[in-house]
C-alpha cells in the first residue's frame, strides 16, 4: 500500500498540473505577484490575507516557482487518494490514476492546481472537510492532524473559503440532527483555527483584530455598481462629508474599475491627485456607506446579490489580466526580485 501511495500520488499530481507542463512554467495571475511580494519584502498587503504568500515561500525559497505548483498538485492528489480510501474502504493506484485523469480532463481542477493563486484551496477545503467529517476510522491520527492544518490554511488563504466552510459545516449540522454519523467538531475546528489565524495576522500586520480590516471597500465597490450604495451617496451627500461626495457624478461605475483603475475615485481624488493606498484610506467611510445601504434597501441588496450570483454561475471567461502589461507591472518584478 505504501509503495502504491508513493508512486500513485506523484503520478496523479503530474496529471493534475498538466497545464503548467504544457505552458512550460507555472500559470500566473496578476495577483500572484502580490502574494510573492508578501514574503520577498516582507509586506502586509491591505487587500490580501497574509497566508498564501508564506505558503508559496515555503516551497519556492527564492529558487523556483515550480516548487509551489508541484506542492499544490501533490496536496490535491493525496486528498483524492484519501477520499478514495474513505469512500471505497481502500485505495488502489489504478483507481487513483483514473480519478486524477478524469479530474484532469473533465474538470477545471488542473487549471487551479497549476495556477499560483489561493483558489486551489477551494477544492482542498471541500475535500478536507468531507474527510474530517466522514473519514472516521479510515484515517490515522496523523492524517486527521494534517487535514486539520491543511483545511485551516485553505480557509484562511482566501476569505471566500470561510463562508464555503461555514456552509458545509451547516449541512453537516443538519445531517447530525437527522442522526447521520458525522464528526461535527472535527469539521468546525479548522474554521476556528483559520479565524484565529486571520485575527492574529491582521492584528500584527494592520493593528486591527478583524477578519478583513479593509473588506468594506470591496463591498462598497460591488454595491455602488449595483446601485444601493450609489443611492445612499446621492441621498446623503454633501451633508455626510464623505470623501466620495466629491465624485458622486462619476458613480456608479464597474466595481473592478472602482477598485483598481488608476483614475478611479479610489486612486485619484477630485482634483486629479493620486491617492497612495486609496482603498485602504477609504475603508472607514466604506463601512458606513455599506451599512447604510443595507439598512435603507435590504431587498435591493438581496436582489443584486441573487442576480450577480446567477450571472457568475452562467458566465465563463478566460484571460483576465493575462496580458503582458499586467505581468510586466505586477509579476515580473517579483520574479526578478526573487
Go through the PLM ranges and name each one.
Residues 124, 160-175, 187-191, 212-213:
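Transmembrane-embedded, aromatic-rich helix segments that form part
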Residues 66-97, 101, 105, 124, ...:
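Transmembrane-helix motifs of polytopic, lipid-linked glycan transferases
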Residues 21-35, 43-55, 59, 63, ...:
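Extracytoplasmic catalytic/substrate-binding loops of multi-pass membrane glycan-assembly enzymes
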Residues 2-27, 104-105, 190-202:
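Transmembrane signal-anchor helices characteristic of membrane glycosylation enzymes that use polyprenol
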Residues 82, 121-138, 143-151, 169:
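Specific aromatic-rich, kink-prone transmembrane helix
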Residues 144-158, 190-198:
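Membrane-interface alpha helices of multi-pass inner-membrane proteins
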Residues 211-337:
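Membrane-proximal stem/loop segments at transmembrane-domain junctions that anchor or position
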Residues 111-121:
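Short acidic/glycine- and proline-prone juxtamembrane loop motifs at membrane-interface regions
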Amino acid at each position: 500500500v505504501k509503495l502504491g501511495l508513493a508512486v500513485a500520488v506523484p503520478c496523479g499530481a503530474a496529471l493534475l498540473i498538466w497545464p503548467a507542463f504544457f505552458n512550460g512554467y507555472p500559470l500566473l495571475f496578476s495577483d500572484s505577484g502580490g502574494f510573492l511580494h508578501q514574503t520577498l519584502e516582507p509586506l502586509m498587503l491591505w487587500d490580501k490575507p497574509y497566508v498564501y504568500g508564506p505558503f508559496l515561500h515555503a516551497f519556492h525559497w527564492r529558487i523556483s516557482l515550480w516548487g509551489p505548483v508541484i506542492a499544490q498538485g501533490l496536496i490535491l492528489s493525496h486528498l483524492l487518494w484519501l477520499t478514495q480510501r474513505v469512500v471505497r474502504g481502500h485505495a488502489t493506484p489504478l483507481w487513483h490514476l483514473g480519478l486524477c485523469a478524469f479530474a484532469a480532463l473533465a474538470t477545471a481542477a488542473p487549471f487551479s492546481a497549476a495556477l499560483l493563486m489561493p483558489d486551489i484551496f477551494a477544492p482542498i477545503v471541500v475535500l478536507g472537510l468531507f474527510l474530517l467529517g466522514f473519514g472516521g476510522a479510515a484515517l490515522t491520527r496523523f492524517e486527521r492532524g494534517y487535514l486539520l492544518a491543511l483545511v485551516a490554511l485553505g480557509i484562511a488563504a482566501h476569505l471566500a473559503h470561510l463562508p464555503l466552510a461555514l456552509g458545509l459545516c451547516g449541512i453537516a449540522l443538519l445531517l447530525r440532527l437527522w442522526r447521520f454519523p458525522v464528526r461535527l467538531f472535527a469539521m468546525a475546528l479548522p474554521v476556528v483555527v483559520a479565524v484565529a489565524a486571520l485575527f492574529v495576522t491582521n492584528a500584527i500586520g494592520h493593528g486591527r483584530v478583524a477578519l478583513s480590516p479593509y473588506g468594506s471597500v470591496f463591498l462598497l465597490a460591488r454595491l455602488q455598481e449595483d446601485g444601493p450604495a450609489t443611492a445612499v451617496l446621492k441621498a446623503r451627500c454633501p451633508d455626510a462629508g464623505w470623501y466620495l461626495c466629491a465624485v458622486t457624478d462619476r458613480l456608479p461605475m464597474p466595481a473592478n474599475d472602482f477598485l483598481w483603475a488608476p483614475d478611479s475615485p479610489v486612486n485619484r481624488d477630485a482634483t486629479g491627485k493620486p491617492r497612495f493606498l486609496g482603498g485602504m484610506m477609504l475603508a472607514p467611510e466604506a463601512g458606513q456607506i455599506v451599512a447604510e445601504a443595507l439598512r435603507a434597501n435590504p431587498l435591493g441588496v438581496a436582489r443584486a446579490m441573487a442576480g450577480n450570483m446567477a450571472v457568475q454561475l452562467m458566465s465563463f471567461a478566460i484571460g483576465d489580466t493575462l496580458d503582458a502589461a499586467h505581468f510586466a507591472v505586477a509579476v515580473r518584478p517579483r520574479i526578478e526580485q526573487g
